[in-house]
Structure formats: structure tokens, C-alpha cells
């Protein structure tokens, strides 16, 4: 019997309900003007009923081709993010020990109504050196402590302190409703219009004060309490790509008397964990108790804050403060030292901000917190904050260098040098204007994270060179040795292309060190991996990506190098141990600097394999983690590899560098391939995406780039540890360069499941 329309709808809803009960959600997309809720409310009600039955709560009204494209991208992005869970970690020491605490961020989408919950756990390291990561055994969980705090500032228990930024008067302001005005016009009449329309134009049941209070943590207007706003299981939003930063007392490698006095004065300041979340805030949690000390809402997320209150947000997830904060010690213009937090929003926005966190205990009111906000920088050429800033001392002064990220207005690569105290632009470099032949202006581009290095070999010298990659495969070189920025010299040292001529995007920061023949041969080795994973389309991209090691002489190159100028090393697959562990072996073609300009390795073992995390150079070993994402947007998966590469040749070392078979020892018999004992270059890490490298040994070489900030290592020892060599400072007659051996450590990274 043919079903009536009503029966057909009933049948569909029954099927959708069954699928949802089985854990399969269905996204409902309407097509054409006929499903526009303003024109056809009956159709809208029908599609909404189907969406509720399907488990997503709302349908997508694709009333035109553009909306259809955007809706499909939103759906795929939600599905992709929903397959992830654990994000990143921080530790309270440079190596794991019994007294160490590991801080692990997390995001969950499987709570009630899939409300994009975040968490940050503090885990102990037990007497065996093992991290106990059971949530029930956590020292604290930030989601729980934040729920227990009072959303009203100054109230008990632990009222929240939240600030934001007013770009009209250029300073921080408390994120509070101004009770002195009766107008629903925002935080205060003078600043309301600058904080976005979400706080200015609402109907009676969605007014600005209710929205602001909701964002602060008031749950009275949530649907579960009779209101119209989205339900939240916990106040803390999902923490996806923001790496938590642990900050205790100042510890930069700086021996000046003024800095030593500053470090001594603040040596016992309470440790704090800083992390961004997709609830619109950067959070500062007390590292001992887990209580939120303060939160900051950067200007780059203003325009999307209103989406957080929508009951349909759970199926239309957005990023907010998704960048990784970092803290560095800065000497201000009055010669006083300050610890400054620098942060951005990652995929959530286009601003870069700075907060003075010298004394966390002083930021105990919203007025004090607002005064500590130094600046919040935006620019027409600043894109989404995928580029991490780096502080460096140059001949012209101390500046914060950053690439402009992606999806900027003009979609070109720019390098910024900002005053770290004021946020003022010291200089802005238009790279394509400097080298027009390097850019295809018809294709979107942007500058990734930069490194700022001292290529002299003298640890006391100024930083003089910037290296950064872009989406078109250019490895840029900016000589900043001249104190006059208009005299900085821009060039491209490498144009990364695969064997078919396809550009190889560079989305992670390069790393640099002195070349293997220094000091007899002057110049730097620069290493970079290629590949991107920024959107859904990247999942299915199978272009070959590569790892490059390029020699950069003091004068640079008149024309960019290409792969034809470099020595190729070829990968092969193999296995080690029982049960077999997949490893990679590599050729050992001769590379001699400066006759050869470097080397490259094509990542050919796994289709779609790419590098999206910055490499690490330690004691002559270049350590690179790669990933092969699953092309299925609905599935977890992907395979990661770790490569331990001889930085001088792009080949493997003559002895094993890692415990490939997992037996707890590094031996020729157990960790090489075949009867001829071929030393592997890399090992498969398993399913999932791995973060950057964490090394646990204490051998600290003199390496580039120079380190600035509390996370910097101590100076190198006068006698190197056993089996570890390091580069000596040029001109030091008592120091002889040692043989460079790789670190013998199996644990090289923390598990990170990410897009």
C-alpha cells in the first residue's frame, strides 16, 4: 500500500530514530527556497522533526548553492571533529620524574546532547615513572572546578575574573554588564558597539545581558532551566588544538643582573596552566588546585560569540580560542622585566594578544586583569592564527615575529615584527612584493610559523635570520641583521615541489642548526617538512610530501633551490621484532656540504603521508613525526611515523637510534632489519595523529634558534653526557666538537588525536 505523506514522514522518523539509537546520526539538508523557514514554516517544522529524530537537533536550509556548500562543509567539519577526543599535554618539568605532574587537555562530544565539553586533567607520575591517566585518579579536573566557581566576579566561591578588550580606547575592560545603563547596548555604553552585534540587538528573550551572563557561566537561561539558550554539561568548552602551557618561576637563559634579580623576586610565584578553549576564552588555571584564576576573551572571536548560546550550536561547532599560548620574559622600555603571555585564536580568529602575567596573584579582580591586558592586535593582512609567534632579540631591538596565518583579506604571506610591550608594528614585510616571482597571486596563500635564529654560532649574538614556509611551498629567508628594517633582505631558499611539479605546502615551522662542517664552512642547515591538514579537502589529497634538509650559506642564493639541486634519499619498508613492527629504511647516498646543497626524502610509504608538526633537531638527529590521515571524514584513524634522521645526510645513522621492537633496549640484533642489520630510519607509531616531539634526556646542545622565555633549557654542560655530542661556541678554544650521536629514547611524543 502506498503511504500517505503523513505515513511517509512517520516511517522516516521511525527509521531515523532507530539509526540514532544505534549511534548513527543523520544530518538533514533541505534544498531550495521551499524549505526556507520564513517562507514555508510547515516544511521547516517537518525537517526539524526529522533532524531531532536523527540526533542532530536542527536541519540545514540550503536555499541556494552557496548555502548548500557552506552547510555541507559545516556538517563534515562537525563529523570530523566528533571523531577526536584527547588533545595535548603539558608537564611541570623538562623530564618525567616521580615529582612530575602531567596536564592533559581533552574534548568530548558524547555528553548529553553533544554539547562540546572540554576538560583539563592533572595527573601524577607514579614511583615507576608511569603517568596515571585514569580520570578518577586525577589530582583535579578543570571542568569540575570551574563548574563549582561563581560566575559573578568577587562572589564566593571563587568568583570568576574575566576580561576582554576595547579596541576604541585600546585597553582591556572587565567582561561585565554595566548596571548604570538601562539600554541593552553591551558591557558599557561607550564600548558596546565595538564588542559585536551579539551584545547590542536582541529580542526580549535574547538580550545582551543574558548573553553576557551565559558566557560568564550563568545557566539560568539554558533550555533545561526554562530558557532559550544551549544546554551545557560543563562550562569549560572543548580544548582541541590549543596546547596547554605550564608556567612557574622565570627561568630564561639570561645572566644579566637585572634579569637574575627579576627571576629571584618571582621564583616562588604560583604555577599556572594557560590554555585556550572553544568557549571563547583563554583560561588560566592554578596548577595546584585547578581553580580558574582568570579568563580572557580576545577581540578576534567577538563576531561569533552569539553562536555559543544557540541550541543548534552542537551540530554547527566553531573554533574560538584554539591557538596555543606561550609565555616569555620581556624587558620593557623602562628596563623592568615582565612575564608576558602571547596568544592567538588558531582557527577561531585573527587577533594576536598579550597579557602581563608576571604576578598571577595580582590578577585577582577584573579591574586588575583588564589593566594587565597589554594589547590585542588585528590587521587587514592578519589571517587565522595558525602561525605561532616567536620573541627574539635583534640588532634593532626585541620583537615578536609572526607569520600572518591563513585566510587573510588579501591571502598573501606577510611577516610581522611587533613591539612585545605595546603591540605596535615595528615592521611588516610583504613577501610577495619583495620576490614577485615566488608567488601565484591567483591562489590563496599565507605565512606559517616562523623561526628566528642566530646563524653566527655565538650564543650571545643577536638573532639575524628568519625562516618560514607558506602554502605554495616557498621556504622564505628574511635577513634581519640590519637594524634598519627597510634594509632587511627577503629571498626564497627553496621552492618545494613534488616530482610532478605540484607545490608542497609548508604549514609547520622549520628548524635550523649549524651545518655539519662548521666552523670550517660557514652557513646553516634548515629543515622542513611539507603537507597540510587545514580542511576537509586536505584529507583526500594524495600528492607526495617530503622532508627537506637545505644548506643556507651566509649570502643565501640568487635563485631558489629545487629538488634537482639536492640529493635524494629513498625510503623502503621493513619490519623489526615479533610481532613485527613496521619501520622505514633509507638509502645512504653521499651528501657533502657545500658541494651538495642538501638532501630530501619523499614520504612514499603511505599514500597521503605528510608533516604537520614542526621537526626537532637534537644532537645531530633530526626527529620528524608524520601522519597519514584517513580519507574518510567519518572515521578515526590515520597512521603516524617518527623518523630519526642524520641531519648531515638525510640518511640513517650507523647504529640504531630508537627501541623499534619495544623490548626496552636498543641493540643491533633487536632493532635492525634483516640479516644484514639495516638500521631503520623511522618507526610506525600506530593509529592516530601524534604531536611534536618531547625528548626526555638531559643532553642540551648549543642549537639554533636562541631560546627566549621560561621554558628555555639551561646552558650546555662543560663536559657532554655519555653518547651525546653538541656544537661548541665558535672561538672557544677549550671546547672541541664531539661526535654527534642521536638520543637513545623510545618515547618521543604524546598521543594527540586531531584534525
Residue ranges and their predicted role:
Residues 2-3, 36-41:
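Short, flexible/disordered intra-domain loops and linkers
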Residues 4-8, 64, 314:
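Residue-level preference for long, well-ordered alpha-helices that form the structural scaffold
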Amino acid at each position: 500500500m502506498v503511504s500517505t505523506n503523513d505515513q511517509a514522514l512517520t516511517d522516516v522518523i521511525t527509521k531515523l530514530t532507530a539509526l540514532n539509537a544505534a549511534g548513527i546520526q543523520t544530518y538533514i539538508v533541505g534544498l531550495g527556497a521551499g524549505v526556507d523557514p520564513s517562507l514555508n514554516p510547515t516544511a521547516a517544522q517537518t525537517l526539524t522533526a526529522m533532524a531531532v529524530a536523527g540526533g542532530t537537533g536542527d536541519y540545514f536550509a540550503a536555499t541556494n548553492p552557496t548555502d548548500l556548500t557552506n552547510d555541507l562543509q559545516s556538517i563534515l567539519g562537525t563529523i570530523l571533529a566528533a571523531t577526536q577526543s584527547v588533545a595535548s599535554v603539558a608537564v611541570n618539568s623538562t623530564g618525567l620524574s616521580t615529582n612530575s605532574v602531567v596536564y592533559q587537555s581533552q574534548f568530548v562530544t558524547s555528553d548529553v546532547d553533544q554539547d562540546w565539553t572540554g576538560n583539563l586533567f592533572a595527573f601524577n607520575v607514579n614511583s615507576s615513572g608511569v603517568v596515571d591517566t585514569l580520570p578518577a585518579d586525577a589530582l583535579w579536573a578543570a571542568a569540575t572546578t570551574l563548574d563549582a566557581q561563581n560566575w559573578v566576579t568577587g562572589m564566593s566561591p571563587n568568583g570568576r575574573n574575566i576580561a576582554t578588550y576595547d579596541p576604541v580606547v585600546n585597553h582591556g575592560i572587565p567582561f561585565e554588564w554595566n548596571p548604570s545603563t538601562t539600554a541593552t547596548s553591551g558591557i558599557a555604553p561607550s564600548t558596546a558597539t565595538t564588542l559585536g552585534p551579539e551584545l547590542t540587538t536582541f529580542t526580549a528573550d535574547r538580550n545582551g545581558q543574558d548573553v553576557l551572563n551565559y558566557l560568564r557561566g550563568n545557566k539560568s537561561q539554558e533550555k533545561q532551566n526554562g530558557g532559550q539558550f544551549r544546554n551545557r554539561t560543563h562550562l569549560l568548552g572543548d580544548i582541541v588544538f590549543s596546547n596547554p602551557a605550564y608556567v612557574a618561576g622565570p627561568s630564561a637563559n639570561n645572566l644579566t643582573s637585572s634579569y637574575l634579580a627579576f627571576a629571584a623576586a618571582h621564583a616562588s610565584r604560583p604555577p599556572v596552566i594557560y590554555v585556550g578553549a572553544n568557549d571563547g576564552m583563554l583560561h588560566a588555571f592554578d596548577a595546584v588546585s585547578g581553580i580558574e584564576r582568570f579568563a580572557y576573551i580576545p577581540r578576534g572571536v567577538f563576531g561569533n560569540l552569539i553562536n555559543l548560546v544557540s541550541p543548534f550550536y552542537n551540530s554547527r561547532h566553531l573554533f574560538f580560542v584554539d591557538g596555543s599560548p606561550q609565555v616569555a620574559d620581556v624587558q620593557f622600555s623602562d628596563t623592568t622585566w615582565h612575564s608576558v603571555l602571547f596568544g592567538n585564536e588558531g582557527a577561531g580568529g585573527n587577533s594576536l594578544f598579550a597579557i602581563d602575567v608576571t604576578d598571577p596573584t595580582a590578577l585577582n579582580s577584573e579591574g586588575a586583569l583588564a589593566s594587565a591586558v597589554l594589547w590585542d592586535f588585528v590587521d587587514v593582512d592578519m589571517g587565522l592564527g595558525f602561525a605561532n609567534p616567536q620573541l627574539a632579540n635583534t640588532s634593532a631591538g626585541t620583537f615578536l615575529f609572526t607569520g600572518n596565518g591563513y585566510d587573510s583579506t588579501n591571502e598573501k604571506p606577510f611577516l610581522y615584527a611587533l613591539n612585545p610591550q605595546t603591540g605596535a608594528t615595528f615592521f611588516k614585510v610583504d613577501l610577495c612584493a619583495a620576490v614577485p616571482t615566488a608567488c601565484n597571486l591567483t591562489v590563496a596563500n599565507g605565512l606559517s610559523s616562523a623561526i628566528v635564529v642566530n646563524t653566527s654560532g655565538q650564543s650571545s649574538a643577536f638573532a639575524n635570520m628568519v625562516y618560514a614556509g607558506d602554502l605554495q611551498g616557498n621556504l622564505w629567508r628574511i635577513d634581519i641583521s640590519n637594524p634598519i628594517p627597510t634594509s632587511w633582505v627577503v629571498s626564497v631558499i627553496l621552492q618545494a615541489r613534488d616530482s610532478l611539479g605540484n607545490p608542497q605546502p609548508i604549514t609547520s615551522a622549520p628548524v635550523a642548526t649549524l651545518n655539519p662542517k662548521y666552523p670550517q664552512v660557514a652557513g646553516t642547515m634548515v629543515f622542513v617538512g611539507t603537507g597540510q591538514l587545514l580542511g576537509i579537502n586536505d584529507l583526500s589529497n594524495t600528492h607526495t610530501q617530503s622532508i627537506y634538509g637545505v644548506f643556507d650559506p651566509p649570502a643565501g642564493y640568487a635563485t631558489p633551490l629545487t629538488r634537482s639541486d639536492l640529493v635524494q634519499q629513498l625510503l623502503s619498508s621493513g619490519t623489526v621484532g615479533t610481532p613485527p613492527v613496521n619501520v622505514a629504511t633509507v638509502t645512504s647516498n653521499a651528501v657533502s656540504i657545500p658541494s651538495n646543497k642538501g638532501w630530501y626524502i619523499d614520504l612514499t610509504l603511505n599514500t597521503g603521508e605528510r608533516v604537520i608538526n614542526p621537526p626537532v633537531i637534537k644532537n645531530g638527529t633530526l626527529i620528524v613525526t608524520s601522519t597519514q590521515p584517513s580519507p574518510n571524514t567519518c572515521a578515526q584513524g590515520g597512521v603516524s611515523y617518527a623518523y630519526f634522521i642524520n641531519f648531515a645526510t638525510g640518511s640513517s645513522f650507523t647504529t640504531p637510534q630508537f627501541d623499534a621492537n619495544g623490548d626496552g633496549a636498543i641493540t643491533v640484533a633487536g632493532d635492525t632489519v634483516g640479516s644484514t642489520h639495516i638500521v631503520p630510519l623511522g618507526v610506525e607509531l600506530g593509529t592516530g595523529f601524534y604531536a611534536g616531539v618531547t625528548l626526555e634526556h638531559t643532553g642540551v646542545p648549543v642549537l639554533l634558534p636562541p631560546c627566549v622565555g621560561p621554558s628555555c633549557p639551561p646552558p650546555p654542560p662543560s663536559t657532554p653526557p655519555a653518547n651525546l655530542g653538541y656544537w661548541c661556541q665558535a672561538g672557544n678554544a677549550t671546547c672541541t666538537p664531539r661526535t654527534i650521536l642521536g638520543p637513545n629514547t623510545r618515547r618521543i611524543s604524546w598521543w594527540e588525536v586531531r584534525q
